[in-house]
């Protein structure tokens, strides 16, 4: 429909291989289709939702749900090849107490997970440090690509003369525990 209307299509929460493959095929045909997996989906798998600790499992309720490692491998490959462009978080944090409200009925557990604070560090650790992404692919998936998609590049998404000085400085060697 988007192609017929001549507009781009931006697909959020890409979590499975089939969706990634549909985006890849559409892009191969020249369609302006973009895919955005979440950092949580790239790094946590379906075992999070079946954990015997009900509080742990409740804290992981989000949509779409976590998938198997096979799906994660496809998404990482998509980021490497450029068939997926941006990594986001869909940050929707809730306290353990809020998540516990639906402990006896998962349908009323608040849907969402944190991720904004951790996105860069987790993507660097699980992407660059494992060899799944190069440092340039990391920058592209966190900054450059979205600026291009939103037609604000090179004013945003690049470190060049005349661009806004939006820079994040952080030490990827610092370690902390995410709970």
Q: Locations of the language-model features?
A:
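His/Asp/Glu-enriched, well-ordered alpha-helical/loop segment
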Residues: 3-6, 59, 81, 85-87, ...
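Histidine/acidic residue-rich metal-binding segments in metalloenzymes
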Residues: 1-87
């Amino acid at each position: 429909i988007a192609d017929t209307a001549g507009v781009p299509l931006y697909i959020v929460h890409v979590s499975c291989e089939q969706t990634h493959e549909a985006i890849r095929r559409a892009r191969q045909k020249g369609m302006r289709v973009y895919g955005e997996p979440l950092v949580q989906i790239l790094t946590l798998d379906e075992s999070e939702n079946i954990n015997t600790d009900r509080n742990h499992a409740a804290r992981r309720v989000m949509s779409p749900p976590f998938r198997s490692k096979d799906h994660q491998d496809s998404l990482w490959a998509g980021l490497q090849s450029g068939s997926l462009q941006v990594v986001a978080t869909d940050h929707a944090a809730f306290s353990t107490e809020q998540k516990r409200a639906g402990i006896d009925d998962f349908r009323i557990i608040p849907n969402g997970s944190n991720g904004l604070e951790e996105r860069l560090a987790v993507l660097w650790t699980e992407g660059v440090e494992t060899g799944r992404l190069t440092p340039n692919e990391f920058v592209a998936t966190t900054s450059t690509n979205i600026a291009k998609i939103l037609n604000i590049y090179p004013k945003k998404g690049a470190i060049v003369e005349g661009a806004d000085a939006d820079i994040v400085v952080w030490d990827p060697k610092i370690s902390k525990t995410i709970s």
